[in-house]
Amino acid sequence: MNSAAAGATPNTRTSRFGGWFRRARSGIDSLPVHLPVRLGGAGIAQTKATPMRVLGFDQALVWVTVALLTWGLVMVYSASIALPDNPRFARAGYGASFFLTRHAASVAFAFIAALLAFQIPMKTWERAAPWLFVVSLLLLVAVLIPHIGISVNGARRWLPMGFMRFQPSELAKVAMVLYAASYMVRKMEIKERFFRAVLPMGIAVVVVGMLVMAEPDMGAFMVIAVIAMGILFLGGVNARMFFVIAALVVVAFGTIVASSPWRRERIFAYLDPWSEEHALGKGYQLSHSLIAIGRGEIFGVGLGGSVEKLHWLPEAHTDFLLAVIGEEFGLVGVLLIIGLFLWLTRRVMHIGRQAIALDRVFSGLVAQGVGVWLGFQTFINMGVNLGALPTKGLTLPLMSFGGSAILMNMIALAIVLRIDYENRVLMRGGRV
């Protein structure tokens, strides 16, 4: 054995290794990565970024997700505890804990599905993206077929799956994230050409939109359209072209609203929910949501103390869960929920930027697409509950009652965690 090596102490070896590691890291960090997509600045081409520090498992993202799921579970029980007294549910034999049990089972099933989704490499997701998109289209067609799709309150949105009702439009959100990201990767060289790159994606969105609007579910279509547009923009589509498309989409949605009498009525009710004409009609949910939030004041009336959930506020355990949170936890609780979702969205977007910095464009766009989805849907749901936006049937991600939504939210976040995991493997010098 070499005498110098034999005489080296453990501290000496550690310091040598530490010095070597620091030099290697500084060499890696000094290498710019040229990115073909937007990272938040004005430029697109030749954007430079470096991977962030190497850490272990992203525990913060997991714990924030767990916190939202747990709080949602508690609030679904609180908001639904009086529903079995409703004759509609009483005839079906629903007990006081029916919705809690169903929601807990949905969360457990979603957790198992998320664990399985996490095991799938991003290369596999990229290859499967077009096929998953086709499957989502077929399910959207199937739900419209009589005696196959389940109709509730005039909307045909669910497929019977035995232990749960599955909503294909939720799968379409995940499918659109993956498909749009893989599409942009394939079209990266011609992304500036409208007819070869942008138009085919627009046609795909229109096809999905026609199927979703036939249910009808305008809220889901809005989310899917924003996901596609967000990924196109983040993928580096010409800004001028993007804003022209955005303007056309806004005009299209405006035309849909203007041509539908009951949608126009919703807009009028949103503008004046307290009027005698709307207070007991289209403005009923909004007015009682505002009453609930107003009753909560700063610190709320306490967990379980909500009055509006006692058959006054419709859909208190789904679309208007935030109103019950505002009543029971007050402004403090609402601000905490907003803060958690802001952090979650920012972290997911950051993981996407980190993947792009490692030249993993598909993974980066998928993560950012999930961030756009969760951030936009949360914004719409909160805006509706607070009276800032017209009433729209969108749930609060990770919290509201709804098995399909919870399942797809968890799978989407599992994919993001997979992206983060692969980022860390690459930064350690491994392969994925």
Swiss-Prot record:
Question: Where found?
Answer: Cell inner membrane
Q: Which GO terms describe its biological process?
A: cell wall organization; FtsZ-dependent cytokinesis; peptidoglycan biosynthetic process; regulation of cell shape
Membrane-crossing residue ranges in chain numbering = 61-81, 98-118, 130-150, 194-214, 218-238, 242-262, 324-344, 361-380, 396-416
GO CC term, one of those recorded: plasma membrane
Q: Which UniProt keywords apply?
A: Cell cycle, Cell division, Cell inner membrane, Cell membrane, Cell shape, Cell wall biogenesis/degradation, Glycosyltransferase, Membrane, Peptidoglycan synthesis, Transferase, Transmembrane, Transmembrane helix
Q: In which pathway does it act?
A: Cell wall biogenesis; peptidoglycan biosynthesis
Under which EC number(s) is this enzyme classified? 2.4.99.28
Task: Give the residue range of the signal peptide.
Answer: none
The question of whether Cell cycle is a record keyword is answered with yes
Q: Which reaction does it catalyse?
A: [GlcNAc-(1->4)-Mur2Ac(oyl-L-Ala-gamma-D-Glu-L-Lys-D-Ala-D-Ala)](n)-di-trans,octa-cis-undecaprenyl diphosphate + beta-D-GlcNAc-(1->4)-Mur2Ac(oyl-L-Ala-gamma-D-Glu-L-Lys-D-Ala-D-Ala)-di-trans,octa-cis-undecaprenyl diphosphate = [GlcNAc-(1->4)-Mur2Ac(oyl-L-Ala-gamma-D-Glu-L-Lys-D-Ala-D-Ala)](n+1)-di-trans,octa-cis-undecaprenyl diphosphate + di-trans,octa-cis-undecaprenyl diphosphate + H(+)
Q: Kindly report, in one word, the top-level EC class recorded for this enzyme.
A: transferase
GO terms assigned for molecular function: lipid-linked peptidoglycan transporter activity; peptidoglycan glycosyltransferase activity
Reply yes or no: does the keyword Cell wall biogenesis/degradation apply.
yes
Kindly give the HAMAP family that the UniProt entry links to this protein: PGT_FtsW_proteobact
What role does it play?
Peptidoglycan polymerase that is essential for cell division.
Q: Which family does it belong to?
A: Belongs to the SEDS family. FtsW subfamily.
This chain belongs to the protein called Probable peptidoglycan glycosyltransferase FtsW
Organism in which the protein naturally occurs: Variovorax paradoxus (strain EPS)
